[in-house]
Amino acid sequence: MCQKKPFYITTPIYYPSGNPHIGHCYTTVACDSIARYRRMQGYDVMFLTGTDEHGLKIEQKAAEKGVTPKEYVDEIVKTFKGLWKFMNISYDRYIRTTDDYHIETVQKIFKELYDKGYIYKGEYKGKYCTPCESFWTESQLIDGKCPECKREVTEAKEEAYFFKMSPFADRIEKLLTETDYLQPKTRAVELVNNFIKPGLEDLCVSRTTFKWGIPVTFDEKHIVYVWIDALSNYISALGYKNEKFDEFDKYWPADVHMVAKDIMRFHAIIWPAMLMALDLPLPKHLAVHGWITFNGQKMSKSLGNVVDPFVLGERYGADAIRYHIMREMALGADSAFSNEIMINRINSDLANGLGNLVSRTVAMVQKYFGGTLPTERESGEFDDDLIETATSLRAKVDDFMDKTQLQNALAEIFKLVSRANKYIDETAPWVIAKDETKKARLATVLYNLLEAIRIACTLLSAFMPTTMPKALEQIGACEKCAGYENCDKFGVLPADVTVHKGDALFPRIDVEKEIEELNSIIKNNEGESEETKALREELEGVAQIGIDDFAKVDLRVCEVKTCEPVKKSKKLLQFTIFDGVKDRTVVSGIANYYKPEELIGKKIILVQNLKPAKLCGVESCGMILSAVHGDDLKVVFVDNMPVGSKIC
């Protein structure tokens, strides 16, 4: 196969403020699978990952432990690299923002943007979120908190350098709305409406209130703010403005940046603006995925709901974990993680599906032919359908991989696995074996199964790189037979192929027993935070009701027409609400969470048949539905349903 063009794929560089968990794994495993698949196709692949090691949070964490920031990140980086080795991640380069060559690149980029007039000195006044290392304006806050992580923000005022964003607003809007740069493209609307339409504000790109960062060469009391520092890794790692590497012209622009949705804005808006200012080509695709959630929440050490991938991998093998997280998550959507979902997926797809197919087929070749098939063949019913399913598979998987739809690619491969298992039931080799005159037909059935397994396992080797070579060895597929170039062909294995019995690829798991042990090891309850524990205990104490009780509550979509504070009360707001038939007055104690003007015109959910009650002299005819978590409260808004719609 002729050499194809270079292919450059990147993960975000991870922030090493603590040890990695399974939530970190998805992006890296997904990128690794794409990189491996492209290598199979003959591409010259550069797969980059790394760590973002500067900032106030690192400085604070190091101080807490009594070590220097560099000593602190050195230890955490060992854990990240150890996890990637454990998960069989085939990255080509690991960049650290503390590397000398990266520092050189960042300083040169900052100076060039300053010389071009895109960076200027001013004074920053506003809000700062330390965990996200992000500046926000008052209008961008949600309930006074960081819109990304929902944590408290602090007042910040300091001399700073700013990057002019507005000159690039039109080009960025076209990039998001008129090209396939952003995947899934549905996210473009929220970015345009939330950040570009209101007017791109200049970006604070330096700090003076902490020292752990890259100094600005011409004003060393300033350090380069995290996003110019971190985002530049994608080009510094190729040798842009440094002499460490000489591969920028070869690999840039990147084919795929893959990131989680919480850093989408930086990669969809800030990074393109930086590249435009530098007169550099833009990346081809930004693939944005959701979060792996646990009990409905994003995995977070602060919530005590993280899952240790080392524990899972040691019990089930890294390939099973790789498969599970890729099979469960669709691009752009969140994916719920639970021990039960994971174990059932491993059992159904890997143990009962693929593993059973391989072991049954190999066992039958050994039982009926001593491990080596005869060369005589006899076609029969069901052969053509299996062969068509197998030979058409590669093109379908190629298409999904081109779209970074790994979940769909895996689902397509397992259609072949299911078809092959069905073929066994349809042809019943154990029945054919009873007729001595049908040896050729029996050999054909088993050969067809081996070929289907060869194609499936070859394509799956990008996703499960440890186990699939073992499967291919068991069915007697040599390295050449197991090549990508042969995945659209049938009849590649030698006619007299010899199989080799091996250990079970994916042993079946006792679900109940394993969940009990996992709960003990991972400490889903004992290791939970006080916040999660309190919530669990609260939920456990809630009395159950029947459907008849629930049916008595009339919940309707209503529209807020007016809203104003209630006199003599700091907590109450008075609403005029239209329920689809008439206006009604409602009083709600949410004044500490919303300004009246924020609620006018909104569609909310109202408990309509609540007995009227007087609050501060105002009769309230209903109750507005809100969600409460700790000290936080949010009204439940309904955007796309007509007023008067019943909630059921």
Where are these regions (language model features)?
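Secondary-structure transition/capping motifs at alpha-helix termini
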Residues: 1-3, 36-44, 65-69, 86, ...
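N-terminal catalytic cores of NTP/NDP-binding nucleotidyl/phosphoryl-transfer enzymes
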Residues: 2-76, 95-111, 115, 132, ...
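Structured secondary-structure scaffolds
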Residues: 2-49, 101-105, 155-367, 409-413
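A glycine-rich helix N-cap at a beta->alpha junction
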Residues: 78-90
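Cys/His-rich short segments
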Residues: 116-169, 173
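Helix-rich, typically C-terminal accessory recognition domains appended to large enzymatic cores
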Residues: 121, 328, 333, 341-378, ...
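Phosphate-backbone binding interfaces of nucleic-acid-interacting proteins
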Residues: 530-648
